[in-house]
Design a protein with these regions (language model features):
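Extracellular/luminal recognition modules and glycoprotein regions
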Residues: 125-329
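Membrane-interacting helical modules
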Residues: 1-124
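Glycine- and aspartate-rich repeat motifs characteristic of hemolysin/RTX-like Ca2+-binding segments
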Residues: 540, 544-626
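Assembly/interface hotspot detector across virion components, adhesins/toxins, and nucleic-acid enzymes
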Residues: 41, 127-129, 492-493
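Charge-dense, extended regions
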Residues: 452, 457-579
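Alpha-helix capping and helix-coil boundary motifs
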Residues: 10-17, 24, 42, 46-49, ...
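Short, charged low-complexity linear motifs
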Residues: 26-29, 226-231, 618
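Charged, amphipathic alpha-helical linkers/stalks
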Residues: 301-450, 457
């Protein structure tokens, strides 16, 4: 911990004290930013809220502290120096509050709240069903430039390449070629950038007749203007072709990554190919194989690849210009085919109204009542939004996939057209939830192919469960930007025994004011504040607030409202807080290191608070409390 040791002893240069104080402020800022789990992981279920913007606090505040230090020359006596330090500290505290408020208002913190890693796991069961949107995608022609074969890498979320393969303006996580291989490209619009899949040679290539190519070799064939089976300098547009080596593997072309064919040693490209189905590893496959001839006379591999992808991880190629008011709105990072929440709201009056109503809601009950509408309005900004999902029973067979049935399985198989009205109605009832899951995942679920009633039931159950987890995560990630934000705005800094610490005094006072008006609201707000903010359990502020929560719980028991309040707060939050209620039987209940409230109910109970400033309530029976 940083110590303030501004010396005022005779013979000591006061400037040393000033340097120490500023050094302490610097370290104190780092203390706040690095040691406070609250500000690093607020409302982020996976604890992955990036702290890059928060670290700007030190850069933001220290110049202001030095500017404030112009009054240092007046600190010529211990009393004056003490006053100066006090003023400086107050400046630090106010600076912190202003900085944090600015971050919230500008959306710098909320914009970093990321749903993707958590939802990637949540949505996986939904994505595994056989749908009409299931197809092999993204087949660019790729050149083996170093002679060791075409090497690829797996899609890797936001850490890997994001590329707009189909030209819809959305870059998605894609399998990719290694940096020692090259994608054959052509800058069709002349802007010096490989904007999307239309600039590659693959299924997104637009042919001269306006149709799309079936694969990369079909697109390449149009560049063989003299029809001799190779594309070389004798062909009209040979000099327009480029090879893109994505050296930094981000899926974004830079000027220094685009090479002429001559620069990478290519003499000619052979139009002939053979169909294949080679597994290249990393979720990528080789679908057509051909070759090219180098300037050195060597023949090397050129192949049409099928990249794996994850449409959940996405970025729109073009951002939306926001007004100051729109930038101040609550925000979540866009995923699938959805923009960031506040960008989507800027383009959709319906979503903007839903977000405003949700933000103004003052209780959990009110927000939960508005949550489905908010998620639905956000989902409707999906450019491919559709609620036309249906079940289909026919068996399917593709070039690479088939179905084999045992006699027992054949009996269980649905006959064509046998989807009952009952299941059609059940699916219809879930249509908006399915559309939302499609929008968030980037999937397409126009038709769900099933072979049995069990598969239909399984799909319907998966939709309900996955949608529930999605909305829960959206709710938790918006908590501290909406209903609980006023409490965050009260966080300050304090100087305790020469150390900078977060100060929750005003936070506790605000909870007290709310409690005086509505004990249930204060109970739920404080419970969620503690359950989802992830304040370090070793922080004194956490101990004080958890003790306050335990007192609210005891008050609720005494007033007969505890069960009502606990139900409003929710089982998950209660468990996170370590608050437990026994049954009518003989229970053994343990708390955790927090300030727990544990009530035994009926029966002869054994209750241990474990650690923290606990309130243990035995209830009826012959109880043991420790």
């Amino acid at each position: 911990m940083a110590q303030i040791y501004a010396s005022t002893k005779p013979g000591v240069n006061p400037a040393e004290g000033w340097a120490a104080a500023i050094g302490s402020l610097s370290t104190g800022a780092n203390l706040v930013l690095n040691n406070s789990e609250l500000l690093k992981t607020i409302s982020d279920k996976n604890g992955q809220l990036y702290d890059k913007k928060l670290k700007d606090f030190e850069k933001w505040f220290l110049p202001k502290a030095f500017a404030f230090g112009e009054g240092f020359e007046k600190a010529i006596s211990p009393a004056a120096w003490e006053k100066f330090l006090k003023d400086l500290f107050e400046k630090a505290d106010q600076g912190w509050k202003n900085f944090y408020k600015e971050q919230l208002e500008e959306g710098l913190l909320p914009a970093l709240l990321d749903l993707t890693d958590f939802l990637d796991k949540v949505l996986e069961p939904f994505k595994t069903y056989n749908k009409d949107g299931k197809y092999h995608i993204y087949d660019p022609l790729t050149l083996d430039l170093d002679g060791d074969g075409i090497e690829t890498v797996s899609h890797n979320g936001y850490k890997g390449a994001l590329f707009d393969h189909d030209g819809d303006g959305i870059r998605t996580a894609s399998g990719w070629v290694a940096s020692d291989a090259g994608l054959l490209v052509v800058d069709r619009n002349g802007d010096g950038i490989i904007n999307d899949g239309k600039a590659l040679f693959g299924e997104s290539s637009v042919l001269k007749d306006g149709t799309k190519a079936v694969h990369g070799y079909a697109a390449l064939a149009e560049y063989d203007s003299n029809g001799d089976g190779v594309v070389d300098a004798k062909d009209a547009d040979f000099d327009k072709l480029r090879v893109w080596r994505d050296l930094n593997q981000d899926g974004v072309s830079q000027k220094e990554e685009l090479f002429t064919l001559e620069e990478v040693g290519v003499q000619s490209l052979n139009v002939a190919y053979q169909d294949t189905n080679q597994n290249l590893g990393n979720g990528n496959r080789l679908s057509q194989e051909g070759s090219y001839t180098g300037k050195d006379g060597n023949v090397r591999k050129m192949g049409d690849l099928l990249f794996g992808n994850n449409t959940l991880y996405s970025r729109y190629s073009q951002s939306v210009n926001l007004t100051d008011e729109q930038r101040a709105a609550a925000n979540l990072q866009g995923i699938g085919r959805l923009r960031d929440l506040r960008e989507a709201a800027a383009l959709s009056p319906a979503l903007a109204a839903a977000l405003q109503a949700y933000t103004k809601a003052e209780t959990k009950v009110q927000q939960k009542a508005l949550l489905d509408d908010l998620v639905d309005k956000w989902a409707q900004t999906d450019p491919n939004y559709s609620v036309g999902t249906r079940f289909s029973a026919p068996m399917l067979r593709t070039a690479n996939e088939g179905v084999a049935l045992t006699p027992g399985q054949e009996k269980a198989m649905l006959m064509v057209g046998s989807v009952s009205d009952e299941y059609k109605e059940k699916l219809h009832e879930l249509r908006t939830k399915i559309a939302a899951l499609d929008a968030f995942s980037g999937e397409k679920s126009g038709v769900i192919y099933v072979q049995s009633k069990e598969q239909m039931e399984s799909f319907l159950k998966t939709v309900r469960e996955t949608y529930g987890k999605l909305t829960d995560n959206v709710y938790e990630n918006l908590l501290f930007q909406t209903r609980l934000q006023p409490y965050l705005n009260k966080i300050g800094l304090k100087l305790e025994n020469g150390e900078f610490k977060l100060d929750f005094t005003d936070v506790a006072a605000l909870f007290g004011e709310v409690y005086a008006r509505s004990p249930e609201k204060a109970f739920v707000d404080l419970g969620e504040f503690l359950a989802y903010s992830k304040i370090s359990s070793g922080d004194n502020a956490f101990t004080e607030l958890s003790s306050l929560m335990a007192q609210y719980s005891l008050d609720a028991v005494n007033s007969g409202t505890f069960e009502q309040y606990a139900e409003a707060l929710g089982k998950e939050a209660m468990e996170k807080l370590g608050h437990k209620t026994g049954t009518e039987k003989d229970d053994t209940l343990y708390g955790n290191e927090l300030a727990n409230f544990i009530t035994g109910g009926a029966g002869d109970d054994a209750i241990s608070g474990y650690g923290g400033n606990d309130i243990l309530h035995g209830g009826s029976g012959n109880d043991t409390l420790q």
